[in-house]
Amino acid sequence: LTLEQGKPVKEAAGEVHGAAGLFDYFAEEAKRAQGRVLVRPTGQRSIVIKQPVGPVAAFSPWNFPLFLMARKLAPALAAGCSIICKPPEETPACCMALMRCVLDAGVPGHVAQMVFGVPDQVSTHLIASPIIRKISFTGSVPVGKHLMKLAADGVKRTTMELGGHAPVLVFDDCDLDRTLDIIVPQKFRNAGQVCVSPTRFYVQNGIYDRFVDEFTKRTEQLTVGNGLEDATEMGPLANERRPEAVGALIADAADKGARITTGGDVLGESGFFFRPTVIADVPLDAQIMANEPFGPVAMMRPLATLDEAIEQANRLPYGLAAFAFTEMAVRR
């Protein structure tokens, strides 16, 4: 996993254990796939029966290839569905190792399968097949929309987890050190290539400057390097396209007045390493405030009131995750 995707081996170990835990969970959940009897006011009884939907086509991403593949494989098998998995191009070997574990555990080869190939060709063929009855996809919003259109032709069920752009609300009554202890590692986990990664930081005026300074100091202390080395806290980005894409968003923000307090460029002359980056005073019209960077970039903006915080957090049509740090359980 580390060799293919780049994340530190400590994070990779956590992903492996997490993937195994999913199989344990859904193995137990299979016992609870029971129907219900509904009694109507007229005395009639309706029986609800849960049945397998049928063969599933599952498409998983490269950021958590084992965990997210397991999150599709395990529930499908527990529900009694066969499944064909299309792994990401960047991480074929670790996904194949997972499938080998499934087959070695006794799942028949005609029940769980894996296919490799050009993504668009594979997805078009599988989704158009009358055999496939459900599609599961984790990835970007544009690709998700494309797959939904393909699925619509066959009126097929879809389950999708698409992009996010998680807001972080930091109020001036928070325990600042504890907040930083939590949020800095969370931001740079897997080099920021996490769909629920904290990205848009809205910090109350009273602690804004201090928060930016302390966040920047901690960011500069991160060890970036080979994921196989024990000291490494952040590895490279996943492929050659990512550094350029992240750099373009940062450059656009800087051109529009944002202040880069640390990072902002590639690290080293080889590989896909990108320096952990903090950008302060980011204007709302910067592309990075609307487009998920999916990289090691934290964007900071000051805020004055709770109403402003809620407004800014909800200004984008993305859900998936949000963070808030305060000592008050109820604010108003």
Question: Which functions belong to the PLM regions below?
Answer:
Residues 106, 134, 142-283, 306-307, ...:
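ALDH superfamily catalytic-core signature
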Residues 1-44:
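N-terminal Rossmann-like NAD(P)+-binding subdomain of aldehyde/semialdehyde dehydrogenases
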Residues 232-233, 271-274, 291-297, 316-320:
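Conserved glycine-rich beta-strand-loop-beta hairpin in the small C-terminal domain of fold type I
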Residues 23, 72, 98, 147, ...:
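Aromatic/hydrophobic pocket-lining residues that form π-stacking "cages" and hydrophobic walls in ligand
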Residues 256-262, 318-326:
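Bilobed periplasmic-binding protein-like "clamshell/Venus-flytrap" ligand-binding domains
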Residues 35-178, 303:
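Rossmann-like NAD(P) dinucleotide-binding subdomain of oxidoreductase/dehydrogenase enzymes
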Residues 5, 172, 239, 299-304, ...:
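A structural signal for short, well-ordered beta-strand elements
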